[in-house]
């Protein structure tokens, strides 16, 4: 049962009793547990957001209710924990962050499942992925040694790798990372992939040392909104040809490839990168079924065709030398075009940088007549090569 003190706080906060507080009152409000971040605590019933001072629900620093609970548990703010649960926060998110027996007992008293730490972690991870709760997930996992150590090392990496269709670590070339860094980059990449603006802005503010990595990830995943924002609004700059190398290693990445091209990357060099990408077939054939292999390889062929549509010339000596050195389905495709039917596509010749216009242009390109015959040809060639 909640104390009269907690219920009183609930009524006062919901009625915005501290919206016009005086600076001299700040110390008293902090001592009474009515302070959040940089001002008196506020709560929006409609949005389920916890705010501080003049903060709005939409602000980057505002907290979803479950995140506020996790923060309160980490800071041992007992009354706030009770208050947030009263508003509807999921107390099981709190127990996984409790560092002391006293705090765990409080969470159990408030309704947490005592077995959650043993039986609920996998389901929690899946829930956070499905609901795209990026910031909540980072609040729970980041620097939470108890939770990170509860995962078997192999299973932990396999779980994250599987949840991201096996491309989660490609950008970092499967370098050795601490579990903390792996968790952070997984969820950061997740936010960029789904273009979750608030999590991206919050994480970019909190982890500025990852700015270059963020731009590379946006390129790799073809998030032109984030590329545009990072490049032009935050002035995060990399050499366009270096950026193109990241765009090329992800299948079906027309948006990423085009944007690097529009920024000045050499498109012939991009085609050469694709043809020299030895890891393509290794990744395709490692632990994948034939159906998945076909889909991924078709995605790389799509990148090759798209580069040619942008003006890359597959018949110049540099590319022909690469073709002679390699033996893959991509080469079979190019060898089959000796009549030089492949040529630049008129729709793609204007270099534009507005993300909305870029998406419209790519959609127009995909809806043109000469795209689909090529796709059918690519499938037949791959199927013949895999027999």
Curated annotation (Swiss-Prot):
Signal peptide: none annotated. It holds the Pfam family ASFV_360. InterPro entries: ASFV_MGF360 (IPR002595). GO terms for biological process: taxis. Plays a role in virus cell tropism, and may be required for efficient virus replication in macrophages. Belongs to the asfivirus MGF 360 family. This is Protein MGF 360-4L. The lineage of its organism: Viruses, Varidnaviria, Bamfordvirae, Nucleocytoviricota, Pokkesviricetes.
